[in-house]
Amino acid sequence: MTRESYLAAGGYRVEKGPEDYDLWLRMLESGARFFQAPEALIEWRDSPSRLTRSHDDYAETQMRATKARYLSRLPAVIENGVILAGSGPIGRKMAKLLLAENIEIRGFIDVAPRKIGSTALGFPIWGPKDLGKKERAAILLGCVGQGKRAAVRTLAKSAGYREGHDFFACC
């Protein structure tokens, strides 16, 4: 992080929620670019007592609300709405947060046969074979637990979505 990129994003803000994540998203908005270093640069000690794991400001609900707030400012999301991959609890929670930000939900994609053809929060649930065919202009958001993220990425890629462009694995 450079001083210029830090200042361009407005620095840290004191508000409820994950301040580091908020800063990174504002840096991204202001034009900063991120990359993965080819090798580990530090060793991180992660204990259960760390604030990230124990303070309400860093709870999953705050992380999701921060993600929804920034996703709702993306021009493509504003113009085209979203489809959420995952109609379970995580997807429904993200949908509610996006609706509160006035983002149009076009529907859900799910792999569970019993859900396909039904609705979640009043929006249609389509199967994986419909991905890329239903509401293709909408931005795809991966809203599943950690164990299923790779499968959503593979499915999105096979349907022609590009991560960071028209697909975001946001949960």
Enumerate the predicted regions with their spans.
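Acidic donor-binding loop at a coil-to-helix junction in glycosyltransferase catalytic cores
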Residues: 17-23
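Short, conserved catalytic or interaction motifs in soluble domains
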Residues: 11-14
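Conserved nucleotide-sugar donor-binding
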Residues: 1-9
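Hydrophobic, well-ordered beta-alpha structural blocks that scaffold small-molecule cofactor pockets
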Residues: 20, 37, 43-171
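Hydrophobic residues within well-ordered alpha-helices
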Residues: 27-28
